[in-house]
């Protein structure tokens, strides 16, 4: 294995090496410093004359007298079922004090998008225990559904709650969570580790933690490490995997940092022009494969800089993924948790995972009616700000009250409150009962008579009388 002393330039986290024999893109590199210490790196770019190497541990102390050795290997993850219950660094090394993982297989982390011909359409409901998601923006197996948040909003709490509570319905269905956090502080890392251990959620999870002071290149590896683990567990052990990636904004910032160090021509707002393609290599690894029992579902979480949904990161994410869940600063200011604004939120594949055989027969029409009633109530708030509530009709006041109760009772729930889908749907019917039946135009009469609280109470009365007599 040849060693080279042909470093010509060190720029930020990058080292430029000349006159090398052909090397592979993504190849691992060992750099030996004059004092004998070593650093690891990865080939980022190759050309006829120059190889660009990104150094994992930073380039402090690296100079033109340092020695570069190309290993002939690429970044791989030690994959094993023993990963479940472990907390790993962003580069896949154990940081929980436990033993190293003995690999059943070492897999390249680059992976590949699923062959479109082999893809199976996402179906079946995943229950998160959060009413605003399960009822109004349902997550289905094989979907990629991002959460658009803002700085200071409780997206980390929501991520932890989903990781604790997420489950698939049906006997014999095994489920696990892969949780990958990128660019987080020590405080956040401590919170994640303690929460997973305290609640017992770690038993069915693999956690990857990349800290803010870790190298930028590791931030680019972390989601790929997580997805490689997900693919192994899903397709080798038939598990249904939910991958939670937070915060993809930190990932994109690392991508921009490395692009700037390489002196590439910037795209929108300084991000590289290939960011769309790069994000697609992550998001498109979710899905279902025909003939395989296991599935991979993704929930990437990102903070929108300046709460701007047109910013390149949420904008490009929205093009690739199948919907979005939007957090609201206004709801957060009201003390509502989780502050999910259901009106701009959307799950494009929701129709494939709800209804008879999945959740409940009334769910699709129930959802349409809930959206319509809440949207009308929110519109009326704007009118009240101009003319005052006294100018509203009795009907309008009912819709205004519905919107308030919807946020207070339906959207708001405890951080450890795990609601099943039946509870969520019944709660929605209780709210719809505030409105006159003639206003429930999006629900068939048979569902009103079956699930409306007024009719359910009538059905319950004979049973209550029998119990009292006995």
Swiss-Prot record:
An example molecular function term from Gene Ontology annotations: proton-transporting ATP synthase activity, rotational mechanism
Domain of life: Archaea
InterPro entries: ATP-synt_VA_C, ATPase_a/bsu_AS, ATPase_A1-cplx_bsu, ATPase_F1/V1/A1_a/bsu_N, ATPase_F1/V1/A1_a/bsu_N_sf, ATPase_F1/V1/A1_a/bsu_nucl-bd, P-loop_NTPase, V-ATPase_su_B/beta
Keyword Ion transport: yes
Membrane topology qualifier: Peripheral membrane protein
Annotated GO biological process: proton motive force-driven plasma membrane ATP synthesis
Signal peptide: none
GO cellular component, one term: plasma membrane
Cystine pairs: none
Subcellular location, record wording: Cell membrane
Keyword field: ATP synthesis, Cell membrane, Hydrogen ion transport, Ion transport, Membrane, Transport
Subunit and partners: Has multiple subunits with at least A(3), B(3), C, D, E, F, H, I and proteolipid K(x).
Family to which this protein belongs: Belongs to the ATPase alpha/beta chains family.
Physiological role: Component of the A-type ATP synthase that produces ATP from ADP in the presence of a proton gradient across the membrane. The B chain is a regulatory subunit.
HAMAP family documented for this protein: ATP_synth_B_arch
The protein, known as: A-type ATP synthase subunit B
Organism: Archaeoglobus fulgidus (strain ATCC 49558 / DSM 4304 / JCM 9628 / NBRC 100126 / VC-16)
